[in-house]
Amino acid sequence: MKTKCAVLPSLFFIIQLVGVLPLRAEHYYFKQISLKEGLPSNVRCILRDEQGFVWIGTKSGLGKFDGHELKRYKHQANDPNSLLHNLIYQIAEDKQHNIWVLTEKGIARYQQQSNDFTFPTDEDGKNITAYSFCLVPDGILFGGKDRIYKYSYNDSSLRLLQYFNANSFKINALSMWDSKTLLCCSRWTGIYLVDLHTGEHRRPPFDCGPEITTMMTDSRKRIWIAPYSGGLRCYSYDGKLLASYSTRNSALSNDIVLSLAEREGQLWIGTDGGGINIL
């Protein structure tokens, strides 16, 4: 564990912008966006898009920051093109630079020209709710409850790709295992491997228990899993434990890991009250 970046109290949120100072690896350029700019303290997710805008998902709406001003997007009962709900789970940008916002009441796709949103529906005309996403070569996958949806670039459609009966398995994180299998993580029921063709599901070759806060596969095809209050573990595809980090054996600042992201070969680890650790 190389570096720890402490987070400030919840009165403001810190966003790491693109510029990295060349002097020392642990020096980053930070910009504070405070409550004065209209940003709530309960930030849940962040995305920096291809154009350089920073999208911020909170429990009370969506923010778009251009480096100077923060624009807010919220559900408006009298506006059919506003967000379906203010609770934001995830924000994603696909390879066609569509911005997807995953909310409590359904997926929204941002329309840049009109500065509002459209909402894909299922075969019954109902909004599609998803909690996670995964980019694939020909589109983007979304993880719902016992369901995996796919947006295809070829025909710009969003359809149900696979249903699997796993007792209300809410997919909070997912990544490709191989060309036909997804690794799916649920907060309370652990991890499954799901066959995209048949819907069959099985446990992976490693067991981290039923309570998993987050999971990711890095650029070296290593699987990082954060059991609740259990630090962070790294596995190979054959189930071999490659590394295990906790407050007892490393500089990890908190054993509850809430988020993981990879940047330039380094793993950014967001913890519960212990700031950001960089591995």
Each model region followed by its residue ranges:
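Carboxylate-rich, polar loop motifs that coordinate divalent cations or form catalytic acidic clusters
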Residues: 1-279
